[in-house]
Amino acid sequence: MKLCYHNHDFEFEKIDGKNKLDILYDETTPEQLQSEIDTCWARVGGEDPAEYVKKYTGRAPVVHIKDYYGSKSENMYGLIDSGDSDKKEEKTSENSPFEFRPVGYGVQDIASLLKAAEEAGAEAVIVEQDRPSMNKTPMECAKMSIDYIRSL
């Protein structure tokens, strides 16, 4: 069994010039904690997600490949289940410039992310989309992601 930490964008905020996620990994050993890099949130947090995945080679058994369109905004947190039902209701993809997209339909360089995951020794790559978009159903979005990855 491995304990992995799944990031969001706020772990890339800096403390004394170093991002919080790096501090977490510096303060633990790979035996204690592995990374589970979510490439969408890494990019939203200001990092190059492919380079960030490679930074934790040997400590990245799981990598989340996730695409999006738009820019960071306060409303984007309403697109994930934060457990705060009041905020979820008011923050939707209709009023947010940020939107999760099927893989290959957003701003991410998916080929470089897959290559980075392989180079880092990832045992699993998870294709994730928190919410459907582009007026598609969840199954249509999943098929779009699968078809895009197969085209690479």
Regions found by a protein language model. Give the residues of each.
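Histidine-acidic metal/acid-base catalytic patches
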Residues: I15-I37, W41-L152
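Conserved anion-binding
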Residues: K2-F12, G17-K20
